[in-house]
Amino acid sequence: GPLFAGLFNTVDGYDTHAKVPDYFNAVNKNALDAGKISIIASGWDPGLFSINRLYAEAILPVGNTYTFWGKGISQGHSDAIRRVKGVKDAKQYTIPVENAVEAVKRGDMPDFTTGEMHKRECFVVVEDGADKKRIEHEIKMMPDYFSDYDTEVHFITEEELKKNHSGMPHGGLVIHYGKTGLKKSHNHMIEYKLELDSNPDFTANVLIAFARAAYRLNQEGVSGAKTVVDIAPAYLSTKSADEIRKSII
């Protein structure tokens, strides 16, 4: 990221939330020195979900924001399972906990622990003679991936994995529940939802839209690192400003 930012206008889907500030600073320095623009973390989370969290919190500052991911395949978690000795292939689904979603929509404003919002479901193909009990234990106890979650492990054949789990679906929800009024007696909910047949296809389209914005902004002389919330929506569109005013506003 930082290397290419010093050479070209760039757009990326950097997705490690906790490291975004440091990544931004590294990219920003090189992009500014080169007179280039780099739009970082511009997938759907971080990305589109970031925009919706910001809008919701700006409009309803008294409230709580909740982000649920899934149901969908997590590529990182699937890779982690494949690294377990004896595993031939695997897919892992991240699934929102329905009771948690319902509690948020009721306006309970709950404080969740890590494992209370999502559960993990794993479909695993093992090598001949592999110890399934050991593999299941290693998966469920894996720190940072599964140990904090309700995790189910299903052992299936390679044919079943290819037939039933070959796609790359994903999605999620951003829900903001807020209150207004002198006595905070008026309740409001903002919800943004994605249901994706193909996570890679959708993410690529998001990146293309922000590439359009990067080109336009650089033509105006803008340089340095930007996040998705720094970009005015009109820069993403294929339509002219006049067309936007006629058909969207």
Over which residues does each language-model region extend?
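A generic structural signal for well-ordered alpha-helical segments
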Residues: 3-4, 27, 31, 82
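Rossmann-fold NAD(P)-binding glycine/threonine-rich loop
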Residues: 13-38
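C-terminal substrate-binding/catalytic lobe of Rossmann-fold NAD(P)-dependent oxidoreductases
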Residues: 74-211
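Rossmann-like dinucleotide-binding core of oxidoreductases
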Residues: 34-99
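NAD(P)-dependent Rossmann-like dehydrogenase/reductase catalytic/cofactor-binding core
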Residues: 188-249
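Rossmann-fold NAD(P) dinucleotide-binding segment
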Residues: 1-13
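Glycine- and other small-residue-rich loops at beta-strand/loop junctions that grip anionic moieties
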Residues: 13-16, 20, 41-42, 66-70, ...
